[in-house]
Amino acid sequence: MNNNFEKSILLMVPQWIQYHVSHRNETTFYVYPEYLKPFLYFLRDHMSTQYKVCIDITAADYPSRASRFECVYNLLSVEYNSRIRIKTCVDEITTLESVTPVYSSAAWWEREVWDMFGVFFHNHPDLRRILTDYGFQGHPLRKDFPLSGYVEVRYDDSEKRVCIESVEYSQEFRYFDFESPWEQVDKNSLLK
């Protein structure tokens, strides 16, 4: 993507963009969460952009940041044979406006981000789990989710039914912190 394109976008909507990064012909715009939807409308409808296809929406979890979830929107302009990445950051409480009115395919991607990370999309037409079970607790791609999960789901052949049991840990003398595995454990508390 050329430098003139980036400059023209920055001149047209400077208040919506936090900053942008260009690396190896890939452009990423970081936008404020409240301006995400208008910015995507702009990129879709403006004659010089024509990003009519939402290829993917995903997220990444950075627990050390105040706005720990980075939502990533990958867009394609068939008209100009160009791709662009839009990122916005939110915390656990802040909701994002659903972009399903802008891109209908976003409905599926937003459901996946909700299911895996717990990022809530306001005004989504059908925000429910898509990859995990209906009774599933938590969001498995968060960094504070335990690797083994909270329950074990298995089929018991002798009882001919699905059994849900609490996870049993086979290792002895190991400290499992269910509160926040990303905090440092005090060495003295392990010796007790």
UniProtKB/Swiss-Prot annotation:
Top-level taxon: Eukaryota
InterPro entries (alphabetical): NADH_DH_suC (IPR010218), NADH_quin_OxRdtase_su_C/D-like (IPR037232), NADH_UbQ_OxRdtase_30kDa_su (IPR001268), NADH_UbQ_OxRdtase_CS (IPR020396)
Keyword NAD applies: yes
Pfam families per the UniProt record, alphabetical: Complex1_30kDa
Alphabetical UniProt keywords: Electron transport, Membrane, Mitochondrion, Mitochondrion inner membrane, NAD, Oxidoreductase, Respiratory chain, Translocase, Transport, Ubiquinone
EC code(s) of this entry: 7.1.1.2
Catalyzed reactions: a ubiquinone + NADH + 5 H(+)(in) = a ubiquinol + NAD(+) + 4 H(+)(out)
Location within or outside the cell: Mitochondrion inner membrane
Keyword Calcium: no
Cellular compartments per GO CC: mitochondrial inner membrane
GO MF annotations, alphabetized: NADH dehydrogenase (ubiquinone) activity
Known partners and oligomeric status: Complex I is composed of about 30 different subunits.
Role played: Core subunit of the mitochondrial membrane respiratory chain NADH dehydrogenase (Complex I) that is believed to belong to the minimal assembly required for catalysis. Complex I functions in the transfer of electrons from NADH to the respiratory chain. The immediate electron acceptor for the enzyme is believed to be ubiquinone.
Family: Belongs to the complex I 30 kDa subunit family.
HAMAP family for the chain: NDH1_NuoC
Protein name from the UniProt record: NADH-ubiquinone oxidoreductase subunit 9
Native organism: Prototheca wickerhamii
